[in-house]
């Protein structure tokens, strides 16, 4: 595709299997497909032990302080949780240097994506994104009957900055930037982020997905967004580096308390449990543990990437807790082979045969390194 050209995705709807009373717009929506569970892996293989390297969880686990906080919160399960997560929002705001009124808490960052898309989009509005990227943007966009404008990424999966700037200048209702990007691991440089913002009208809402930010804190996102001056939301999560994927905890920071107020009108009441709030607060306050786990993960990622380089395997420059690599054997064949070695990875539909593999504990990565040569050369 020539630089600067855009794709407007208009996929044909699925043929309904029954006379559905549901909204017609949902007929063309494919639901999100999560990574394989441990139970499914066991059913398929008959094995009982696996390294789960498909969903970018932190296999090192959360801070030890989380378990104590969870047990304390369980003492009163009959009491509703704080509906606004005020204690957690105050702690987040204090560390990030923003008013708690600009912080929103959600059950996972996917819920925050949903809130923003439903609050912002009318049918026919446009969303600008760059594929391949996290599929829920397109899913929620189609549920909102929005028009998806896709500026495909370059061959190395970096954002095509001039093309995105040209598309952003046309004033989409919502601009989505994922950095580091899922599933490729690429991260925006500060100069490129600044260029995209400079091209974007202040009538556009900018949504920045920073679920993997702890692995690559390259620049002050909030300061650059505030300097731009339009409406924005940055989404972050406790599911990755903080190790709380099973408790579903995400949070975001917005450009203004007024924007958060609109999101609160959509957010269901009591949507974040008392246990999840307590766990997130304990994890948030143990920054020493967070740093140790992030540092170890980055070091282990470098070890895996060095092996890939020695093997001559093409991979991206990942800035997250996973590697994204091309499999000569094909993604499905590679994933199936590794599954029977006790390794669950994520095949992707990205053209060219790419798989995404979470960086696990050192022992998980040892097993992966030992199994990769055969899995990639089937």
Swiss-Prot record:
Among its keywords, does the record have Transferase? yes
| Pfam families to which the protein is assigned, alphabetical | Aminotran_1_2 (PF00155)
EC number(s) on file: 2.6.1.9
Please give the organism: Caulobacter vibrioides (strain ATCC 19089 / CIP 103742 / CB 15)
Name the pathway.
Amino-acid biosynthesis; L-histidine biosynthesis; L-histidine from 5-phospho-alpha-D-ribose 1-diphosphate: step 7/9
UniProt-listed Gene3D superfamilies: Aspartate Aminotransferase, domain 1, Type I PLP-dependent aspartate aminotransferase-like (Major domain)
Q: What terms describe the molecular function in GO for this protein? A: histidinol-phosphate transaminase activity; pyridoxal phosphate binding
What GO biological process terms are annotated to this protein in UniProt?
A: L-histidine biosynthetic process
Q: Which UniProt keywords apply?
A: Amino-acid biosynthesis, Aminotransferase, Histidine biosynthesis, Pyridoxal phosphate, Transferase
Task: Show the PROSITE patterns listed in the entry.
Answer: AA_TRANSFER_CLASS_2
Under NCBIfam families, the record lists: hisC (TIGR01141)
Q: Which family does it belong to?
A: Belongs to the class-II pyridoxal-phosphate-dependent aminotransferase family. Histidinol-phosphate aminotransferase subfamily.
What would be the name of the gene that encodes this protein?
hisC2
Q: Which reaction does it catalyse?
A: L-histidinol phosphate + 2-oxoglutarate = 3-(imidazol-4-yl)-2-oxopropyl phosphate + L-glutamate
Q: Which residues carry this modification: N6-(pyridoxal phosphate)lysine?
A: 240
Any idea what this protein is called? Histidinol-phosphate aminotransferase 2
Q: What class of enzyme is it?
A: transferase
Fetch the InterPro entries from UniProt: Aminotrans_II_pyridoxalP_BS, Aminotransferase_I/II_large, HisP_aminotrans, HistidinolP_aminotransfase, PyrdxlP-dep_Trfase, PyrdxlP-dep_Trfase_major, PyrdxlP-dep_Trfase_small
Provide the assembly information.
Answer: Homodimer.
Required cofactor(s): pyridoxal 5'-phosphate
């Amino acid at each position: 595709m020539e630089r600067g050209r855009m794709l407007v995705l208009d996929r044909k709807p699925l043929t309904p299997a029954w006379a559905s009373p549901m909204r017609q717009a949902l007929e063309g929506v494919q639901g999100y497909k999560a990574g394989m569970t441990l139970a499914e892996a066991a059913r398929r293989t008959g094995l009982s032990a696996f390294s789960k390297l498909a969903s970018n969880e932190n296999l090192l686990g959360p801070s030890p302080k989380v378990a104590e906080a969870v047990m304390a919160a369980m003492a009163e399960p009959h009491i509703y949780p704080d509906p606004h997560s005020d204690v957690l929002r105050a702690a987040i705001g204090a560390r990030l240097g923003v008013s708690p009124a600009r912080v929103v808490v959600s059950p996972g960052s996917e819920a925050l994506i949903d809130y923003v898309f439903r609050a912002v989009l009318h049918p026919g509005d446009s969303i600008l994104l760059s594929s391949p990227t996290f599929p829920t943007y397109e899913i929620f966009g189609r549920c909102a009957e929005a028009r998806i404008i896709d500026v495909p990424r370059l061959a190395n999966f970096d954002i095509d900055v001039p093309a995105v700037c040209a598309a952003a200048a046309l004033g989409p209702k919502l601009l989505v930037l994922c950095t580091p990007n899922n599933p490729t691991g690429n991260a925006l440089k500060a100069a490129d982020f600044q260029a995209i913002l400079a091209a974007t009208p202040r009538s556009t809402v900018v949504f920045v997905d920073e679920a993997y930010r702890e692995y690559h804190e390259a620049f002050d996102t909030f300061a650059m967004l505030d300097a731009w001056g339009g409406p924005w939301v940055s989404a972050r999560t406790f599911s990755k580096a903080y190790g709380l994927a099973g408790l579903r905890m995400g949070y975001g920071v917005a450009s203004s308390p007024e924007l958060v107020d609109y999101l609160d009108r959509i957010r269901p009441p009591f949507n974040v449990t008392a246990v999840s709030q307590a766990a997130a607060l304990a994890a948030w306050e143990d920054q020493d543990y967070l740093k140790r786990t992030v540092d170890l993960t980055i070091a282990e990622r470098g070890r895996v990437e060095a092996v890939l380089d020695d093997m001559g395997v093409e991979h991206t420059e990942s800035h997250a807790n996973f590697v994204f690599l091309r499999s000569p054997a094909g993604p499905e064949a590679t994933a199936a082979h590794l599954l029977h070695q006790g390794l669950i990875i994520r095949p992707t539909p990205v053209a060219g045969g790419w798989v995404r593999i979470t960086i696990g504990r050192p022992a998980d990565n040892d097993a992966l390194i030992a199994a990769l040569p055969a899995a990639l050369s089937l």
